[in-house]
Amino acid sequence: MIERVKGTRDFLPEEMVKRRWVFERIRERFETYGFKEVLTPTMEYTKLFELRSGEEVVKQLYAFKDKGGRDVSLRPDMTSSVARLYVNMFQTAPKPIKWYYIANMFRYEEPQSGRYREFWQAGVELIGSDKVEADAEVIALFVESYLATGLREFTVNIGDRILLDEFAKMLGVKDDIGLMRIIDKKDKLPQEDFINALKEFGLDKNGIEKVLELINIKGKPDEVLPLAEELFTSEVAKNEINRLYALIDLLEAYEVKDWIRIDLGIARGFDYYTSIVFEAIAPNDLGIGSIGGGGRYDNLIEVFGGKPTPATGFAIGIERLIPILEAKGLIPEVQIAPDVYVVPIGERMKKVAIRIATSLRKSGIKTEIELMGRKLKKAMDYANKVGVKKTIIVGEKDLERGVVTVRDMESGEQNEVKIDDIVEFMKNALKT
């Protein structure tokens, strides 16, 4: 027996109904903000991801040579692919460009709660605006996308890579990206291991204390931003803090400020982020951390050969979101069994059964027809097992009178219904 590949999953019908429900809630919200759907190839040239994705992501690539000897990889995220698409075809298009996607990604990492080697994300990319209004629009949509699924207990924590750059300069650190990678692991490592990582990086006791001070600057914007003003003194940092104040002001107008927190220790794992970054956290007992994140990446398009173009976006982690929604009972139970099961009694009734099933299907009624040649009793057993609501029994004697027998599988009640009236009867019967 061949097993499925480690870190991947098979989704059964019951699970697919739940996933589709979540996808549609999010898709609906994306489209109300004017975003349009795109989909890029599952494979890209490996160089695309090596340029600016970050050391950890590059290590996790599913990378290989194709039969032509070209280095290709399965996509680990969509932002790089969307940026490549923009550079290839849309540089002269009217701005801003507002695209969304719902797609699968691949990373070779150790499977754990909410983490798989194949996983799905739903995200948006807003290309062409460097304005704080674009950041606010994207973060507001990020919040509203979770709200659309019924989730209420979560926060969106906002940090800033420019402030982290300035912090590195304050410490005299030249390898700011290296420091950010360690800071990004602050919630993934025990504090002792985190401090040891900072020591190995080369920070002295004073530098480590400064880092610990920084990562504890988090909380409600009105409380935290004044603390940031005290910590940072450079003109660059002050300008960026003013941008954060402006962002929070706009998010209040979007009516999402209640979900917003500031966390200056957020770095995010991708090297392409340039300023504002953010991630969503929902309290849970499942061992799941961030359920999505994003930020501004103003240099990525230029790295891929395009003209300098600002951009921002986010991705929602579907594999992390769904278990939390399930644990909170937020995904409704959806009927996956057919509404109607048509059972012909005898060989001569098969075509009649097909015609009845066809008329019901054309009317939008989910209908299954008996295909296994079962006798009536076994057909009824099957109908009960799969949860069919109504069964139509097509018998020769009934047909002579132009009727069929409709059985309610829950109550056992039976009705004779004229074949010509069956569609209307079923529509009414299924409403109750």
Curated annotation (Swiss-Prot):
Q: Name one GO molecular function term.
A: ATP binding
Which transformation does this protein catalyse, written as a reaction? tRNA(His) + L-histidine + ATP = L-histidyl-tRNA(His) + AMP + diphosphate + H(+)
- EC main class here is ligase
The record's annotation in CDD domains points to: HisRS-like_core (cd00773), HisRS_anticodon (cd00859)
| Gene3D superfamilies found in the cross-reference section | Anticodon-binding domain (3.40.50.800), Bira Bifunctional Protein, Domain 2 (3.30.930.10)
* Known EC number: 6.1.1.21
User: Which key words tag this protein in UniProt?
Assistant: Aminoacyl-tRNA synthetase, ATP-binding, Cytoplasm, Ligase, Nucleotide-binding, Protein biosynthesis
Which Gene Ontology cellular-component terms appear in the entry? Answer: cytoplasm
Pfam families associated with the record: HGTP_anticodon, tRNA-synt_His
Q: Does the keyword Aminoacyl-tRNA synthetase apply?
A: yes
One of the protein's GO biological processes? histidyl-tRNA aminoacylation
Compartments in which it is found: Cytoplasm
- Which InterPro entries is this protein grouped with? aa-tRNA-synth_II, aa-tRNA-synth_II/BPL/LPL, Anticodon-bd, Anticodon-bd_dom_sf, His-tRNA-ligase, HisRS-like_core, HisRS/HisZ, HisRS_anticodon
Q: Which family does it belong to?
A: Belongs to the class-II aminoacyl-tRNA synthetase family.
Q: Provide the protein name.
A: Histidine--tRNA ligase
Species the sequence originates in? Pyrococcus furiosus (strain ATCC 43587 / DSM 3638 / JCM 8422 / Vc1)
